[in-house]
Amino acid sequence: MGIEWEGVKVEIGELVVEGDSESEMEGPTRRELLPWDRTLASVYDLAVVPGDSEEERREVARTIVTLCCEGTAGLISTARLVVELLRQTGENLDPGFDAETPLPLYETLLGSSPECADDLEAGLSYAERELTSSVSELLRSHSLKGYESVAMHAGAIGLLAMEIADATPSTLMEVTESEEVFEIGTDDLPRRPTVLLVGHLPLLGHIITEELGTLARQVELVGLTHTAWPNREDHVRVVGPLSMYHEYLSSGFADVVVVDGACPGEDVIEAAREGGSKLVATVGARVADLLDVTDYPVEEAVEVLVTEEDAVYVEEPIKAVEIAAWAALRVEGSRDRREPPRRAFRVGPPTRLTDVVIRNVGVPVVAGNIPGIVVLVSCPEKSADVEEPAKIAEVLLERGYLVLVPGCLAVALGSYLDDDGKTLYERYPDTLLNTGPCTSAAHLVGACIRVGVIFGKLPIRGEFVRVADYVLNRVGACVIAWGGEYSEHLVSAAYGVTRWGIPVVLGPDPEAGSLLVEKNPKVIDACSGEEVEDPTPEHLRCVVSDWKEAAITAARLCMRPNDTPEGRQNKVESYVELYRELYGELPPDLDLLIRDESDIPVTLRSEIRELLEETGWTPRSRASDPTLLPEG
């Protein structure tokens, strides 16, 4: 029995019984992790969803599960594509950065470290099996907390697929690396037949140009994808972020567009028609009812595309690009040449968080000299959408936070300039890091796990709950997901991140205040077994109304029960200064964040003491070994 969903085929086969030789590759099921989900739900208000009645709220929760499953299905499809390409090349797995534990999500869930395509295949088989289980839960009636558990499980599985997809292109890509800010854009595109690759295909540009041979040199191969690299002749030239695809397609500057199974939806066909471009959809593309010319000879497929159809489907990606290139040569002289959007992006060099980087960053994060790590994720669809996430990044960078940006936002930030014409990358080269493709979001979660491996000697193989508990109570990081609308990939990732113990801030939503129910999180001191009041982080997932609230909330959610007095002082000082800058007063919740006198920053001692006296604050004990697990 099996199901197919967005290019993912999930088969339910035989069960692996205990003692089987393959059992060591079996990852945890949702039911095995349900106690952890219930622990999180008992401490944090995760299952808070809008609705006037219980029935309406449950329907919203069910929709969230559906989005998480759709997002995870797409991520698995992407991972399968790149793993198959890895298998075809025969290359050994090389994640592209120096780390003793390069794929920590895989190692935590599956209990081993992958070394080749077959190992990655085993990880995807597990992901597909658990996705099937999550989909089947949609047929059952759950409580809000039950749907929350299913959504988090689907999201966590999606992050595993992300990690696999992120590791593989590092082996396959051959792009020019840069140690400095570099510029991409459309300003100097030559006027010749143009093929625009939209999605993941630009990452494999060197394979495409090699396969197409002289044909590749007769056309201009340009791309919209979720990362960028300096231009080179034998690769696809990136001209903008994937999230802005509608703006680029509708401009009509490309003669033919090739779209794969990345983020774009069915509106790509309409956008291409609006621009007068032909379109070729390939594996995973979310389009329907196109003529499938996969089995046609190339010449016949080109003829059909040029003379009969506006858009066709080709299953094999390289063949799809070949058909597009020949078609571009045919149609280029028969259509009005249009100008591309005039866009330029000065992008910071993609940075991998190696063990060396984590060691250098880990100590100041623990000490509070770096008050926290904030991962900022957004999918700006047009230039105006960049301003708010850029402002969030800017105010956090000014206060010393380490800000990591993956995917389309990492590219789009290259268009946000100050009065002197400088980008944030040029102003904050050491603390604003472009981490690469959007799939690197999983690598960012993995970096939090590797902090525990490097500094806490944390055993991770098969230890999901122990790892998530460590991250939640000791690693001062949070994620901000920003935008008017979220793709299903982003929804899936947001719920998966929560499962790993990393707080997520969502926004903007003008109705945000009505969605928050306050709790008073407590932790257990494993040394004494006593329950200790320490609402840091105060939320694991929350919705905010505007960019200022997002920045403030992120600063607060980077505090942890394990903070040393010096570390908490520095975090409180950064939080107070940021709050004052944005709102002109002291934050009203300092009584929740200051455990005793040693947490009060020296430079703010008198005024904070005065505020604490007004609130009736009394010192609290601190947990020397914080955990949410009763057994410690």
Swiss-Prot record:
Q: Does the keyword Iron-sulfur apply?
A: yes
Pfam families per the record?
Prismane
Q: Which family does it belong to?
A: Belongs to the Ni-containing carbon monoxide dehydrogenase family.
> What InterPro entries does the entry give?
HCP/CODH, Prismane-like_a/b-sand, Prismane-like_sf
In this chain, [Ni-4Fe-4S] cluster is annotated as bound at 200, 226, 263, 379, 408, 438
Q: Which Gene3D superfamilies match?
A: 3.40.50.2030
Role description: Part of the ACDS complex that catalyzes the reversible cleavage of acetyl-CoA, allowing autotrophic growth from CO(2). The alpha-epsilon subcomponent functions as a carbon monoxide dehydrogenase.
Q: Which organism is it from?
A: Methanopyrus kandleri (strain AV19 / DSM 6324 / JCM 9639 / NBRC 100938)
| Keyword Metal-binding among UniProt keywords | yes
Q: What is this protein called?
A: Putative acetyl-CoA decarbonylase/synthase complex subunit alpha-like
The alphabetical list of record keywords is: Iron, Iron-sulfur, Metal-binding, Nickel
Q: Which GO terms describe its molecular function?
A: hydroxylamine reductase activity; iron-sulfur cluster binding; metal ion binding; peroxidase activity
Example GO biological process term? Answer: response to hydrogen peroxide
